[in-house]
């Protein structure tokens, strides 16, 4: 509460963060693996750790969910549908630009931590410039030295692993698509997700768990659709 004794309010971004972290919590709380080293998130491959957390974020964009959990502080009215529709439109604004930017970061990371050997005509900056020439929509000015401060892949733990951000989005979107097909609040599908993804933790390969849940290999279609990047067929 603030100095006027008004309750603290959550923005929509706050709710997304809450659902995201709750997804990690569910991964731990709903494990059935007794070995601590493989229970919950433990021993799950780096590029699948974010599957449950990013999966939960999808519920923050569902009308049936937001309608029942939102209230105006003064009128107690739920979120108006027209405002929700505007939120969806804003969510997908320039989604393609953000998509290719993440691809730029991931490809650069792989190049640097793969076969890269510095030498004449082969600097870190030149590697980044080459990647940008292939995928970037807007090329930064020549003085830009983003690579010098790309802490995720140098000072952080994402060396040769930055791609995991986007791959986890593929997995989580495709997993959520199963709920869209069955009903986003389907108890049966929730039980299946628990049994095949959350309960097993790191006791088996994440891709094997995904196949067990979805019945097939991961597909990118749901991620593109969720980002408004699929063409409407007349």
Question: Which residues does each PLM region occupy?
Answer:
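Cation-handling catalytic/transport regions enriched in His/Asp/Glu
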Residues: 1-234
């Amino acid at each position: 509460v603030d100095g006027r004794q008004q309750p603290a309010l959550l923005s929509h971004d706050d709710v997304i963060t809450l659902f995201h972290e709750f997804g990690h919590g569910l991964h731990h709380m709903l494990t059935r693996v007794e070995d601590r080293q493989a229970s919950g998130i433990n021993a799950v491959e780096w590029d699948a750790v974010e599957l449950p957390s990013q999966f939960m974020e999808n519920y923050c964009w569902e009308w049936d969910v937001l309608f029942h959990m939102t209230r105006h502080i003064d009128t107690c009215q739920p979120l108006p549908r027209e405002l929700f529709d505007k939120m969806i439109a804003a969510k997908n604004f320039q989604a393609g630009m953000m998509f290719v930017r993440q691809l730029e970061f991931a490809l650069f990371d792989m190049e640097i931590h793969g076969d890269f050997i510095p030498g004449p005509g082969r600097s870190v900056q030149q590697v980044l410039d080459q990647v940008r020439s292939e995928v970037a929509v807007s090329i930064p000015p020549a003085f830009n030295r983003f690579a010098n401060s790309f802490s995720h892949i140098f000072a952080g733990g994402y060396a040769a692993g930055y791609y995991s951000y986007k791959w986890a989005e593929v997995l989580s979107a495709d997993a959520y698509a199963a709920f869209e097909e069955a009903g986003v609040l389907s108890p049966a599908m929730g039980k299946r997700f628990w049994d095949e993804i959350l309960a097993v933790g790191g006791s088996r390969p994440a891709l094997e768990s995904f196949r067990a849940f979805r019945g097939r290999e991961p597909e990118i279609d749901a991620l593109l659709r969720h980002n408004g990047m699929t063409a409407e067929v007349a």
